[in-house]
Each structure stands twice: as structure tokens, then as C-alpha cells.
Amino acid sequence: MPRSRINGNFIDKTFSIVANILLRIIPTTSGEKEAFTYYRDGMSAQSEGNYAEALQNYYEATRLEIDPYDRSYILYNIGLIHTSNGEHTKALEYYFRALERNPFLPQAFNNMAVICHYRGEQAIRQGDSEIAEAWSDQAAEYWKQAIALTPGNYIEAHNWLKITRRFE
């Protein structure tokens, strides 16, 4: 049974109803409809913290979805789950894959920067300043890209870039 039929959350039910209406109105192929259903069910499972179920739905959605823009959001959400699970290498891979299909995802650049910054902080705690600097430099590059795409957002990152003298 599709997740949209079992979810008790009012907002999720409302979203599901609107999404189902749009799927009937907008001319789409059955494959596109099926991909969207898996994506929607993945988002619902993810919002409830059911990451294994969300990943299953997202993987199926990526198998069916042919539009690069839509695929980018599926891949981005897979990256979010891997980030939440502490699987940073996998998360970075999925953020990269999302950006290959849609280079205008500032949130992917931001999340990549956060992971790099975290790894830099880990290196500092381990006493490896050279590795820490490399990770911090990489974080700076990703934050610059996120800020360039959405000026005025990512204020904390912008301040960090200024404080660390990495902002040009």
C-alpha cells in the first residue's frame, strides 16, 4: 500500500491529495507518475525518520525518473539521509551526483561544506593541522558557491569565511 494512504499526518495527507490531483491533471507518463509516487513516499518516510524505507523509495524513484532536474532532488535527499546517518563519504557522493544534474542547488553545496568543515574540526582534534586546513579550504569553496547562488543566505557561513579570511 502506498505510504500516502497510511500516513496519519494532516499536512502529509493534504500534500498527498494535492499531489494526486496534479498527477491526474498534468500530462505525464505512467513512469513519471510512478517515479513521483516513490519520491513522495520517500519524503514522507524521511520526514518520519524512517530512513531505510525512504532510501528504498528514493532508489526506486531514481530508477524510474528520467528528468535530470527531478533526479537531482532525489539524489540530494539520498545525500541528506546519508549525512544524518553519519555516512559522510556516501553523502558527498550523492550531493555531487545531484549537482551534476542541477548545478543550482545551494543546499547541496552548503551540506558539502558542512561535512568538510566537520572533517576539518575532526582533524584539528587529532592534531593534524595540515589536513584540517585542506578540509577547511574545501568547505570555504563550497560555501562560496552556495552563497553565490543565494546571496543573503548562509549568513553564518559568510561570517566564518570572513573570520577565517577565506572570503574574497
UniProtKB/Swiss-Prot annotation:
Return one Gene Ontology term, BP aspect: photosynthesis
What the entry lists under PROSITE patterns is as follows: TPR, TPR_REGION
**Annotated membrane topology:** Peripheral membrane protein
- Where is this chain's protein located in or outside the cell? Plastid, Chloroplast thylakoid membrane
Listed SUPFAM superfamilies: TPR-like
CC annotations in GO: chloroplast thylakoid membrane
Q: Which UniProt keywords apply?
A: Chloroplast, Membrane, Photosynthesis, Plastid, Repeat, Thylakoid, TPR repeat
Per the record's keyword annotation, is Lyase included, yes or no? Answer: no
- Per-repeat ranges for TPR: 35-68, 72-105, 120-153
What this chain does, per the record? Essential for the assembly of the photosystem I (PSI) complex. May act as a chaperone-like factor to guide the assembly of the PSI subunits.
PANTHER family, alphabetized? CELLULOSE SYNTHASE OPERON PROTEIN C, TPR REPEAT-CONTAINING PROTEIN MJ0263
The entry assigns this protein to a family as follows: Belongs to the Ycf3 family.
Q: This chain belongs to which protein, by name?
A: Photosystem I assembly protein Ycf3
